[in-house]
Amino acid sequence: MKAKKTVGSSGSCVRAPALSTEPMAAVKHLAQIPRCTETGMICTQGCVTIEDVTVYFSQEEWKLLDEAQRLLYLDVMLENFTLISSLVYRYEAEAEEKTCAQSLSQTEAPQVRTPKQGQLRQKPHPSDICITVLKDILHLNDLPGQKPYLTEVCTKPQDHKHHRAKNWLKRDVDSLVKSCIFHVAGNPFICSKIGEKFPAIWNLLQPKDIPNGEKQNKIKRGKAFHRDKNNSESDEYKKSSSPQHRLHEYPGVCSAKGGFESNSCEQDLNKYSPAPFRMDQTENRPYECHVCGKWFGQKATLRIHQRRHTGEKPYKCGECGKSFCQSSNLSEHCRVHSGERPFECLECGKAFGCHSSLLRHQRTHTGEWPYECSDCGRLFRQIVSLITHQRTHTTEKPYECGQCEKSFSHKATLTVHQRVHTGEKPYHCEACGKSFSQSANLIKHSKIHTGEKPYECGECGLCFRQRATLMKHQRTHTSERPYECRECGKFFKQYFYLIEHRRIHTTTEFYECEQCGKSYTQKATLIRHQRVHTGESPYKCEECGKAFEYKSRLKRHQRTHTGERPYECAKCGKFFRESYNLAEHQKIHTKAKPYHCDQCGKCFSRRADLVKHQRVHTGERPYTCGECGKTFSRTTNLVQHRRIHTGERPYECDQCGKSFSQVSTLTRHQLLHTGEKPYKCSK
């Protein structure tokens, strides 16, 4: 190793200090060169040149340095070169301004003198000196068969201002690092670890905003990038300056053979590949994020961006308390509560609360499925759906509930689930004030008030509010039972019934009725059943005061007052109050009786009728009167019997006002007023 003697611009000689023969001792000494405490610049007596802070290694010493030592050496040299070059530019700029001022003061009228040929001499650009020295100490010229990946970019007359000259230096050193970093390391290294140990290199690799009209070339995994050695220097420089070849300027950084070895390395290279330095970058985007290095044109935009790193959400919804980092996101969210839908689809007229939802909806008309699963080939309209679907292949459930430790595949499902514990119901119906924990349930509920029933059955013409209800209804025509119990082989029409049935096999605790001994898997089902014995009827009709054991029966009863018959038979046009009455009626047209009694061979159109009929053979009477203990095989018979004890007579004659406990008795009584005699003796 040797120390060179150099001469500064002022003529004073400065010799680099004598260093140890150990290679890394020289690097450590170079990193400890004294600097100014205020500016961080190198402090020396007199004028300092670039070579004054340069340590040279011989070929033998260079080979002794490992990868980390070479990168550390390069990092220290880059920092020193940047500081020295800045001093040179500042010194030359001040000297030139001083010379111009003196010449103007000495003569009243400036005289223009044409220089003779060869008289005009261009000063060597400081970056040329920097590049020459750096190429020398890194032994780039000694590599066999390698052309230096540098061009003479600084041969123009030195008429640049100070800030423009700094930009030239930035571009030259940046180009040098791109071309030689692999030769310095000798082996592949991980991009994400550069910033931890080599800050000067890291500053050159920080992401830059690319000007409009330029796009970075996308790097695909497994593809190698090699420079063509046959190309000339000028062609090579032109290609390297174009945006299409900008990412090729890091040959072998992530792989010794030119290919990527890992996804993380590919992402790091794609993220931190530097773009050429431009003066208008910092002028048009002067505000930089210190966390990720992104630049912004306005300070307010930077503040909004920084909330992603800090997690700050200053905009809070007054209805449900949900917080957002941007006011625009809050405005979109408030439309959930207000029901405002300003974005309308031109195809079908459907409206949406935000523009992104409209764009996703429009794909249903265009048939576009742009996102494909690489594992199974399934297509999706939304990238969120693809990400959620891909977790079915990995069984990944990263979102865990802190209350019950249940895991979910995506965060939205976890948020909805947590409302089970908190009882939160942020979605309110404007018509009736009812609240819901999910927006989908509110949409379904709102159709009750609007009367919208968009899903129509092709067999009978019956319409439904939900598609799932239509699919369940269609099984009444086909008698399809797609849900099978793996334990006993029993089939069910609905998945809900299968889940209820499975508890028979899995549940060890049953809820037994003390009156009749019947067992149930759920306590709520037992409570509903006990109303049969106790006669409790908590649901009361506001019109007539009649009470019912179940809410569903109250709804069906209320149709007797309103006269509503929403279920129409497509064959004969007859209307019915209940869907099951329509289903039974339709079997008259089809004459289908799929349920057979094993005892007598009698056929029935409904399974429930078969169960009731089988009690004739078994003698089973599961329904008992709480007053007298009399038993019945059907609930309707028990209800009619109770009226003997209560004295209830709900069926009144319109002609004479007489009341009856059974509708059949009222029908026979009305024959007295009409004089009708429908029963004729066949003999």
From Swiss-Prot:
Keywords: Metal-binding, Nucleus, Repeat, Zinc, Zinc-finger. GO terms for molecular function: DNA-binding transcription factor activity, RNA polymerase II-specific; DNA-binding transcription repressor activity; RNA polymerase II cis-regulatory region sequence-specific DNA binding; zinc ion binding. Residues 225-239 have a biased composition (Basic and acidic residues). Pfam families: KRAB (PF01352), zf-C2H2 (PF00096). A zinc finger (C2H2-type) spans 287-309, 315-337, 343-365, 371-393, 399-421, 427-449, 455-477, 483-505, 511-533, 539-561, 567-589, 595-617, 623-645, 651-673. Residues 48-123 form the KRAB domain. Residues 102-124, 209-247 are annotated as: Disordered. It is found in: Nucleus. GO terms for cellular component: nucleus. It comes from the Eukaryota. Residues 102-120 have a biased composition (Polar residues). GO terms for biological process: cardiac muscle hypertrophy; microautophagy; negative regulation of cell growth involved in cardiac muscle cell development; regulation of DNA-templated transcription; regulation of proteasomal ubiquitin-dependent protein catabolic process. InterPro entries: KRAB, KRAB_dom_sf, Znf_C2H2-type, Znf_C2H2_sf, Znf_C2H2_type. Its main location: nucleus. Transcriptional repressor. May play a role as regulator of the ubiquitin-proteasome system and autophagy-lysosomal pathway. Belongs to the krueppel C2H2-type zinc-finger protein family. This is Zinc finger protein 418. The lineage of its organism: Eukaryota, Metazoa, Chordata, Craniata, Vertebrata.
